[in-house]
């Protein structure tokens, strides 16, 4: 809604990789973008889910069915994907506290079983899909959060970081902030630092952005102070 939720396509001659699937029933929006690029759902060769929140994983089962693509996710969030556990939310401020009571985010979505499960500090090379990049475990927002590093200078980090007001993506999109929910800010700071240490210059996220490395480093320092204060 209002451009606050981002999903990403990595495209080459072999097809494309979809990173996150949006809310349930948003497949028409994805189809519209695919058509503009002269692509169809069957051109999607892999679906990467950065974490289990409904605005990222809510349409995964439908897109998996429409595309026939494999889904990669992390074992840390598996009970939420399969519906074994109800999602819990650790609010970072007033908006998170209010938003967590809204029906949409609490609504269960269609269950699915990821085809490829990362565990611990696993990495998944995307070369087999013609992409110079890797999927890596980056816990903190949720225990099962993952990120994608591309060409060693770009990263798609889900909700490890956000920008803009409310959910993100509206006004002040150049300023980093904590997302409405975050389980472990210390882990988030460590994972963002690890990604920056790889030489990543541009960070793309689920809400707002993109952000340059300099702004992400500033946010990391704020998180460190938050933890120690």
Residue ranges of predicted features:
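Short N-terminal helix/helix-N-cap motif within the alpha/beta-hydrolase-1
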Residues: 27-28, 52, 57-59, 143, ...
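Residue-level marker for buried hydrophobic side chains located in beta-strands
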Residues: 17-19, 48, 71, 154-156, ...
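Metallo-beta-lactamase
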Residues: 24-25, 116, 123, 132-139, ...
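Conserved beta-strand hairpin/beta-sheet module of binuclear metal-dependent hydrolase folds
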Residues: 1-37, 148-163
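Active-site HxH/HxHxD metal-binding segment of metal-dependent hydrolases
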Residues: 35-116, 122-123
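Binuclear metal-ion centers of metallo-dependent hydrolases, dominated by the metallo-beta-lactamase
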Residues: 211-229
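Soluble, non-transmembrane catalytic domains of enzymes that act on hydrophobic metabolites at membranes
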Residues: 43-49, 54-65, 126, 130, ...
């Amino acid at each position: 809604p209002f451009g606050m939720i981002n999903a990403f396509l990595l495209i080459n001659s072999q097809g494309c990789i979809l990173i996150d699937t949006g809310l349930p029933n948003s497949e028409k929006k994805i189809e519209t973008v695919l058509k503009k690029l002269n692509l169809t759902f069957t051109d999607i060769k892999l679906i990467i889910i950065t974490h289990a929140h409904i605005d990222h994983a809510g349409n995964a089962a439908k897109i998996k069915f429409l595309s026939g693509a494999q889904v990669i996710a992390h074992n840390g969030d598996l009970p939420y994907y399969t519906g074994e556990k109800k999602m819990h939310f650790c609010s970072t401020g007033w908006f998170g506290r209010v938003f967590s009571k809204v029906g949409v985010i609490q609504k269960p979505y269609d269950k699915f079983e990821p085809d490829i499960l990362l565990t611990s500090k696993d990495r998944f090379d995307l070369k087999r899909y013609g992409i110079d990049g890797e999927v890596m475990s980056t816990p903190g927002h949720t225990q099962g959060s993952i990120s994608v590093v591309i060409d060693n200078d770009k990263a798609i980090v889900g909700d490890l970081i956000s920008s803009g007001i409310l959910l993100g993506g509206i006004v002040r999109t150049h300023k980093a902030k904590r997302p409405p929910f975050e389980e472990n800010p210390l882990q988030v700071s460590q994972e963002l630092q690890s990604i920056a240490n790889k030489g990543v210059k541009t960070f793309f996220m689920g809400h707002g952005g993109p952000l340059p490395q300099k702004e992400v480093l500033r946010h990391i320092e704020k998180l460190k102070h938050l933890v120690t204060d």
